[in-house]
């Protein structure tokens, strides 16, 4: 029996699922009657999605499709940070959607403090973009996960729990 147990708290998304989502959106945009001639482009570049389209109406339709397909592929909608649409060349609109990944330092401190305040038998360490929660019993760690899940609704990022040992 190990002396202590631990798990990591991260904020991440499955990149392959996101690629599949973008592919499905492109396919639907090319097949839908109202969007077929809009000359809409979606590009996934590093940590952002770039949408080029003809009008505000088609932009809203494409964003709705992206959110719908992401939900069906079990991607949290909290990973999307929609920037303001801007005018692009040729009377077109461009919208950049930033993808949130990793725990920000202030969020990590807030989560760490809330766990420490409620559970005295658990140690929390901030490790870059993640939190390492360590405790002597699995029950304490499960309580820590419960505390974090309750707080997740108030956060602007999704939380995942990994490396449960």
Swiss-Prot record:
GO terms for cellular component: cytosol. Keywords: Nucleotide-binding. InterPro entries: DUF520, UPF0234-like_C, UPF0234_N, YajQ-like_sf. Transmembrane segments: none annotated. GO terms for molecular function: nucleotide binding. Nucleotide-binding protein. Belongs to the YajQ family. This is Nucleotide-binding protein Pro_0479. The lineage of its organism: Bacteria, Bacillati, Cyanobacteriota, Cyanophyceae, Synechococcales.
């Amino acid at each position: 029996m190990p002396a202590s147990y631990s798990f990591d708290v991260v904020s991440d998304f499955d990149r392959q699922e996101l690629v599949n989502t973008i592919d499905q959106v492109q396919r639907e945009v090319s097949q839908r009657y109202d969007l077929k001639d809009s000359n809409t482009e979606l590009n996934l570049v590093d940590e952002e999605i770039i949408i080029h389209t003809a009008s505000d109406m088609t932009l809203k339709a494409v964003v709705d499709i992206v959110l719908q397909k992401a939900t069906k592929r079990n991607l949290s909608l909290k990973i999307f940070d929609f920037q303001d649409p801007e005018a692009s060349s040729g009377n077109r609109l461009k919208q950049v959607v930033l993808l949130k990944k990793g725990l920000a330092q202030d969020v990590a401190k807030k989560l760490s403090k809330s766990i420490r305040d409620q559970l005295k038998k658990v140690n929390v360490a901030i490790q870059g973009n993640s939190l390492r929660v360590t405790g002597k019993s699995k029950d304490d760690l499960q309580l820590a996960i419960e505390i974090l899940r309750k707080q997740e609704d108030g956060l602007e990022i999704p939380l995942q729990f990994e490396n449960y040992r």
